[in-house]
């Protein structure tokens, strides 16, 4: 496994723990009949660390970018088939007359 993948998994685990801690904290506040204003500072720090780890993993895990060669056979455009029996040009745009007001 790649290091970026492991860091990403660890970041997701930290984010899920922060979500669980926030839900648990809100439940505790409901029991104590207090109002929820914001999550505790340790949950906010977990969110920031987890987000940073996930972003770092997302940028490093895919690998290096490959160059695109213009003469490569894989870069050819997809052309329409020569058999035009399956092409249908019957659509709502035909109802509107074309406006040809060309001024040069």
UniProtKB/Swiss-Prot annotation:
Residues 1-2, 62-104 are cytoplasmic. Residues 24-40 are lumenal. It is a multi-pass membrane protein. GO terms for cellular component: early endosome membrane; endoplasmic reticulum; endoplasmic reticulum membrane; Golgi membrane. Keywords: Endoplasmic reticulum, Endosome, Golgi apparatus, Membrane, Transmembrane, Transmembrane helix. The chain crosses the membrane at residues 3-23, 41-61. It is found in: Endoplasmic reticulum membrane; Golgi apparatus membrane; Early endosome membrane. InterPro entries: MMgT. Signal peptide: none annotated. Its main location: endoplasmic reticulum. Belongs to the membrane magnesium transporter (TC 1.A.67) family. Component of the ER membrane protein complex (EMC). Mediates Mg(2+) transport. This is Membrane magnesium transporter.
């Amino acid at each position: 496994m790649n290091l970026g993948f492991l860091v990403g998994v660890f970041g997701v685990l930290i984010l899920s723990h922060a979500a669980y801690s926030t839900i648990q904290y809100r439940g505790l506040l409901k029991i104590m009949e207090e109002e929820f204003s914001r999550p505790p500072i340790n949950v906010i720090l977990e969110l920031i660390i987890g987000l940073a780890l996930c972003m770092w993993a997302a940028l490093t895990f895919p690998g290096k970018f490959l160059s695109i060669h213009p003469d490569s056979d894989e870069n050819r455009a997809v052309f329409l088939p020569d058999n035009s029996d399956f092409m249908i040009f019957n659509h709502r745009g035909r109802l509107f007359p074309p406006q040809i007001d060309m001024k040069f």
